[in-house]
Structure formats: C-alpha cells, structure tokens
C-alpha cells in the first residue's frame, strides 16, 4: 500500500486494484499457491485474495486487520498531514512519483479507508484456508470487530498481544515472531488446526478429525 517502488497508476490504492495486482504477481512470478502475511491494508488484501482466488492461497497471517470500513476508524474528512524531512527523503528515494504525490497518496488513502473494505461475515465464512488473526489489544478499531473477524473464519486462530497497538509488529517483535513461527510450524499438522481440550468454535471439526477413519467414511 504505497510503500513500494512502483509509480501511481489509475485506480491506485483501491483494495480491488491492489488485490488484482497481488494476484497477477502470484500468477506471473511465484506461479504456485502461497502463504500470505499482511499487516493492516496488507491483511485486508490477503483476505480479498483468498475470496477472489482461493486456489492461490495456502494460509494467511492477518495482522491489525479490519474487514469492513464502518468500525469507527478515526479518519477525518480532511486529515492534517504533517511530513517530516525524513518522510520526504524516504519517499524521494523509493518512489518514482514526483514529490507532490506523497501528500496526494496519503489523502487518497484516507478517502478510501472511509469507504473500503466492504467484506461481510458471510464472505469471511467462505475462506477455508488456515488464518491467524493477530493484533494489538488497542487497535484503531474495536476488539469486538477483531473477534467478529476471527469467529467468522472457519479455520482461524486468534492472538491479541497485550500492551500493544496497531504497531504491534514493532512494539513486541519477539512475541509476534514467536506466534507466527508457531502457526507456521503447525501448518505441517492438520493445516494448523489446533486440537484442544475444551473446544467450542472448533468442536465439530475437531471431532471429525479425531474420529476413527472407518466412522468418517
């Protein structure tokens, strides 16, 4: 989301545009199903890829992600944009866009965040790959929204890291790395489906997985 080295094009920053770009990259460069890790907008795009092309997604780690725009995010109609000299220098070094585009891109982002994404719980229920929902306990959106995301996904795990915000990756890097490593290790067994002692959401599927094969058949 505007952090790369590609210049701005028509339709840029809309989630549909970014999803199509990501799908094209997977198809043309990686050429096989992938494990996706997305932070913030990247998490949204990862979920949208799984909705559009489930055949391309093996698993998702979704960090600090909202699935709908209407969750009380603090985006003013006309945001105050304050760019430091360091911000401007990094943009000039990285982006082929002219300098004035930096502020325009930020304003475009705010405008889109006020209207997108528009996923529903019913949409999320169709994503069958393993998903790790990871976030801080003080995100810009409510923890209830994060729990709705988690409980709407049929094969998901939830990690809320205490004492962190939307910058959880930077605030508790060792904790985040440990959680991600455990999830990735578990992908080797039952597609990261955890077998627990007292399941509620996972009870039906766990019973099916643990049933003798002749009973399943």
Protein language model features and the residues they cover:
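Catalytic active-site module of serine/aspartate enzymes centered on a nucleophile-bearing elbow/loop
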Residues: 162-217
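Conserved alpha/beta-hydrolase "acid-adjacent" motif
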Residues: 140-145
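Active-site nucleophile elbow and catalytic-triad environment of alpha/beta-hydrolase enzymes
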Residues: 107-123, 137
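Flexible "cap/lid" loop of the alpha/beta hydrolase fold
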Residues: 44-52, 56-90, 199-201
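Short beta-strand/loop motif that positions the catalytic acidic residue
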Residues: 126-127, 133-135
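Catalytic nucleophile serine of serine hydrolases
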Residues: 6, 40, 64
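Active-site loop/oxyanion-hole signature of alpha/beta-hydrolase fold enzymes
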Residues: 1-37
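Catalytic histidine neighborhood in serine/cysteine hydrolases
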Residues: 146, 150-167
């Amino acid at each position: 989301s505007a952090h790369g080295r590609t210049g701005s094009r028509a339709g840029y920053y809309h989630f549909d545009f970014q999803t199509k770009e990501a799908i094209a990259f997977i198809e043309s460069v990686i050429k096989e199903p992938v494990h996706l890790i997305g932070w913030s907008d990247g998490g949204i795009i990862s979920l949208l890829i799984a909705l559009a092309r489930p055949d391309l997604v093996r698993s998702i780690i979704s960090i600090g992600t909202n699935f709908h725009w209407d969750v009380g995010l603090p985006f003013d109609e006309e945001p105050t944009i304050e760019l430091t000299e360091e911000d401007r220098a990094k943009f000039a070094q990285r982006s082929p866009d002219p300098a004035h585009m930096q502020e325009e891109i930020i304003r475009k982002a705010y405008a889109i965040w006020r209207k997108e994404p528009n996923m529903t719980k019913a949409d999320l229920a169709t994503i069958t790959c393993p998903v790790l929902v990871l976030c801080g306990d003080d995100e810009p959106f409510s923890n209830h929204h994060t729990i709705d995301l988690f409980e709407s996904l049929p094969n998901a795990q939830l990690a809320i890291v205490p004492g962190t915000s939307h910058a959880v990756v930077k605030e508790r890097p060792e904790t985040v790395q440990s959680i991600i490593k455990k999830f990735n290790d578990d992908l080797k067994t039952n597609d990261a489906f955890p077998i627990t002692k007292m399941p509620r959401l996972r009870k039906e599927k766990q019973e099916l997985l643990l049933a003798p094969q002749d009973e399943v058949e």
